[in-house]
């Protein structure tokens, strides 16, 4: 009898811990979403964060009932499919994070700074971090060209490339080393259009550096190789915590899209 009671208490404590974990996760995700909303960072990743917050709250509140409800028939297969999806998502997250490092050697021929958002003609904090990393790189290897790549913004208030070029010149980078690519609307186009400019201007690009955020390195390197930049090195920049969560969630979708639709 004592053994049965003891097992029951252990079971109840486990349920309480599970509920508490998902309640806390729900609150943290909700706070993350509110902060990004206040900042004006409205993206697909933000909507996913709010959706996950709601799902975590529902699971914390009703996980026993939901588990029992999905214990047989089609709902059981649906539960297994959801678990499989979560596992695949976590594997992709691990893959992305495992590649989020810098591997430059400061002997490359050119730098490509990938666009990351502009508002009212000013670079976003994320893009500023990339440009600052590029400036630091230039001070260590000034015998290069810097391509800033990014087309019209969501609000049609100029191109990312123009804002990036202005930021670089305002911070001491000579105008004659800056190459502007202002037509692209995706990472794949960043590379394709920049490579065409390099070839038209006969700029050496045997070895290049691409500058982007840590969460974006894996996909950016795959696209670079796909577009013919065989010797592409990553210059990784940090992402602040509130931006990182939705960005990583969204990046998984980007990687899946890349493998399924883009790299053919």
What does each of the following model-derived ranges do?
Residues 1-10:
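Short, Lys/Arg-rich, polar N-terminal cytosolic tail immediately upstream
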Residues 10-13, 40, 69-76:
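Juxtamembrane loop-transmembrane helix junctions in multi-pass integral membrane proteins
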Residues 23-34, 54, 80-93, 252:
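Hydrophobic alpha-helical transmembrane segments of multipass integral membrane proteins
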